[in-house]
Amino acid sequence: MKTQAQLRTELYSALYANTTLPNNIYWIGKPTITSTFPCIIYTFLDDIGGYAFSDGLVSEDVTVQLDVYVDLGDQANMDIIVNELKSVMYTIGYRNIGQPAEFLEADIQKIMRATRWEKWNV
């Protein structure tokens, strides 16, 4: 079983290696008004959907949330990014769970779409 640090490295490397995706890829964060957009934020969730900060061994069922932030009016670019995310995540063995959720982040005036992914860590 991989540690969370190994899973995080594997995910970041796969996302960063895709030349179609933006290079602004961050782990557990929230963009600010001065951040460069579009950007991707990824977080590992624990068994009940909360944030997991541990570097120890994780459960066999790993859940990742990917948040894509784009400027207002840039939904077409968001769709392209999300489709590329699907390709990357399927390639490294994750499957999409649930439907994407889309929000307006009023404090930074950006649109955010969250998707969740699951992988068996065996």
Give the label of every model feature segment.
Residues 1-52, 107:
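Small/polar-rich, solvent-exposed N-terminal microdomains that initiate assembly or binding
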Residues 12-22, 61-74:
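N-terminal short leaders/motifs
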Residues 73-81:
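Short, conserved charged micro-motifs
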Residues 51-57, 77:
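Short histidine-centered beta-strand/loop micro-motifs
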Residues 58-72, 110-120:
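Oligomerization/assembly interface segments of phage tail-like spikes and tubes
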Residues 83-122:
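Acidic-leaning, charged glycine-interspersed low-complexity segments
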Residues 8-19, 80-94:
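Amphipathic alpha-helical segments
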